[in-house]
Every structure is written in C-alpha cells, then in structure tokens.
Design a protein with these regions (language model features):
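A short glycine-rich beta-alpha junction/loop motif
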Residues: 68-71, 82-89, 100, 119-141, ...
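Non-catalytic DNA-recognition/assembly elements of restriction-modification systems
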Residues: 1-11, 132-147, 155-156, 166-167, ...
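Interdomain signal-transducing alpha-helices
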Residues: 102, 143-146, 299, 303, ...
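Short, well-ordered loop/turn sites that connect or cap secondary structure elements
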Residues: 59, 247, 252-253
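Short, ligand-facing micro-motifs at secondary-structure edges
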Residues: 11-16, 33-46, 55, 64-84, ...
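Low-complexity, Lys/Gly-biased intrinsically disordered segments
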Residues: 1-36, 52-54, 192-231, 244-248
Length: 387
C-alpha cells in the first residue's frame, strides 16, 4: 500500500476556543459526513485560525477518505475543498492508481478493516493498518474497465434497492392507515375518552443519568432498541448488577409493560416488554403499566397511531433534542371502549399488521442480499471475475 498511497489525517481545533469555529467557512468533515460516495457538505465548519492552530489540513476535491474510528471503513470522495478531523484518513497522494479504483478497492476491504479494529468501547484502526494492506495495481486501462463495470452493476443494484426502499415506505404508510382506521371508529362512535394517567396503574420516567455500560451483565434498554410494536435486541446493552438495581428503584419493569420513547431522534415510539425479559430503563424513555380496564396492546397501538403523532407535534419541546414531558403524556386522551372491544380491536390491528410484517421481512432480506451482492461484485471485480 505504501508504494501507491501516501496517507494523512486531519485534526480537531480546541473546542473551548470559539474563534476556531464561530462564523467559520472551511468545511470540516467528521465521520458522520462520510456517505460512501461523493461528499459535498459538512456538518461543521472551522475558521482560518482554527485551521492554523490544529492538525487539520486542507485537502482538494477528489480526495479519497477512509474512516478509522467507530464506523471503520466508511468511505467518501471529497467533492469540495475541505479539511477533516483525526478520525478520517485521506489519500494525500496516489501513485499508479486512480481515486475511484482505490475507492472500490477499499470498499472491498471494509470487512477486513473492521476485523482489524482494536479498542474498548469503540474499535479503531490506524494509518499503520492502512499502510499494511496489499493492493493489486493493474494497468490504468484495466483499472478504468474495472471501475466502469463495477459502477454499471451497482447502478442496476441501486435501482432494485430503490424499489425495495419505496416498498418499505409504502408499508410504513399502510401501518399508519391501519391504526388510523382502527381508532377513528371510536371517534365516530363518540366513545368516552380518558386521560392516560387515569387508566394506568403506574407511569414512571426513566432515571435521568447515563448508565455505565459493561460487556456482560443485566440488560439495559436504549431507545435505539425501540421499534413500533416491539423491542429490537439485536444490539443489546448491559449494566452491572448494582447499576441495574439502582435503575429499578422507582419501579421494576415487568413483561407486558408499555415503553415509550419521549426524547431525541427516536421520539414517539411505543413497544412492549416481552415475556421472560428482565430489563432496566436507559435514558429518554418512560414506562406505562396498564390497569385492568385497559389492554396494554391497545394502549401501545394508540401511542403509535397518527392521532398521538399529531398531539406530540403540538406539545414537542426543544429543537436540538426534541422531547415531550411526562406530565404532558399523562394528560393525553385515549378512547376507552369496554375491554372486549379493546381486545377485538387489537386482534384486527395485529391481523392486518402481520401481513405487513411478513412483506417487510421479505424486503429486509432482499436488502441484506443486495448488500451481500455489492461485496460479491467487488470481490469478483478484483479477482478478475466481472470484467
């Protein structure tokens, strides 16, 4: 690698020096700006003074970028003149290889880079690891043919992925339509409404502290685990026994309890703790335990319905971190038909949503296969299989 690429990395101006950032006009890239494509925008900008007093360096448009921290192997090609922080490596000089050829070669090497990552809470790689890689360097015309064929195949794949993503969006719309229709019935019938606080046995906010995470221990939920209608524990997080006990002093969460995200990017999503699961609450969430006159799934579906979405929009506070207060949620009105009608409504909703979920699983499988296909295309390309 060192024979064909000279790697460099950027830096971060001192955060406490406002003159390094205020009214800055130099795009300063962080890993979140990398998009596995051409990067034309940055979340942050720095000033000339910030540039001079840090390790950040101006790099030209057309430069290859590779993430070294966290999202290891995330790529980009600069579409603008900019600088980066130290978490991003950039190709200062390429010898005998084109930028696009190296871009796709590094994309093929992503899984290997991830496996070479080291660290505690966040795995990282270094420039030393990048320099240790071997790279195949065919003649320029072969490189051009490879890039052309890869992009041709990726273009076909992108069209299929776009169709799948559109299907997912349509399924999301259908979900909301099912919930809207189910609860509109009660509006038309003028079914009595009650404040949520009046028909729940317990409504408990989460502890207002960041838990100390550990590799193994008791399960502690984050709002990133929340999906409408269920918990996604594919990426679990754990805390120690003592932290767990401390976080359940207000109320021990039980299977069947309704969880609701009330802050941040994942705002307004309700799910239920499934049977056999012992958990404590992380941050930005609350717990609702229904009484005998309220079906917990009826409450969950109502919290996920368009009716509550509109109420949340009216009551939302904060811009950088949107949130809704527990006190406001307690005052939310919910139609309360008799328990038998609630049970029937839940059955109808879940019968219709089960079809939706089946299709969504098929779509997700196809999307995963598309990602695998990209890697297969890259692997074959650099082994001479697609040209």
């Amino acid at each position: 690698m060192t024979e064909v690429v000279t790697w460099g990395s950027g830096g971060t101006p001192k955060a406490t020096e406002s003159q390094y950032f205020d009214n800055g006009d130099i795009p300063w890239l962080i890993i979140g700006d990398l998009n596995d494509g051409v990067v034309t925008e940055s979340q942050s900008k720095i000033t000339e003074l910030g540039l001079k007093n840090s390790s950040a360096k101006i790099i030209p448009a057309g430069t290859l970028l590779v993430a070294m921290y966290g999202s290891i192997g995330k790529l980009g090609i600069t579409g603008i003149e900019c600088c980066t922080n130290q978490a991003i490596a950039f190709a200062k000089e390429l010898r005998g290889v084109s930028t696009k050829y190296m871009f796709y070669y590094m994309a093929m090497m992503k899984s290997k880079l991830i496996s070479m990552g080291k660290g505690g809470t966040q795995n990282n790689i270094s420039q030393t690891i990048l320099k240790s890689l071997n790279v195949i360097v065919p003649p320029p015309e072969v490189q051009d043919n490879l890039v052309f064929r890869i992009e041709e195949l990726f273009s076909e794949l992108d069209k299929a992925v776009e169709t799948l993503q559109t299907t997912k969006q349509q399924l999301a719309v259908y979900r909301q339509a099912v919930l809207k229709e189910a609860f509109e019935t009660f509006k038309r019938k003028s079914v009595p409404e009650r404040h949520i606080a009046d028909i729940c046995d317990y409504i408990v906010d989460c502890p207002h502290s960041t838990p100390k995470w550990v590799e193994e221990g008791k399960l502690c939920l984050r709002t990133t685990n929340f999906r409408k209608g269920f918990l996604d524990l594919s990426k679990p997080n754990y805390v120690s026994n003592s932290t767990f006990e401390n976080r359940i002093t207000r109320l021990r969460p039980m299977p069947g309890d309704v969880l609701y995200s009330r802050e941040g990017a994942i705002l307004g999503i309700a799910c239920i703790i499934p049977k056999g699961l012992e958990v404590c609450l992380g941050q930005r969430m609350m717990l609702l335990r229904t009484g005998q006159n309220l079906n917990n799934k009826f409450l969950m579906h109502y919290l996920n319905s368009p009716f509550l979405n509109s109420v949340i929009t009216e009551n939302i506070g904060g811009s950088a971190s949107p949130h809704i207060n527990v006190g406001d949620i307690k005052k939310f009105l919910i139609p309360v038909p008799d328990i038998n009608e609630q049970d029937q409504t839940v059955q109808i909703i879940e019968s219709r949503l089960s079809v939706c979920e089946s299709i969504e699983q098929t779509v997700d499988t196809a999307l995963a296969q598309a990602d695998a296909m990209r890697q297969s295309i890259l692997k074959q390309a650099f082994e001479g299989g697609v040209v």
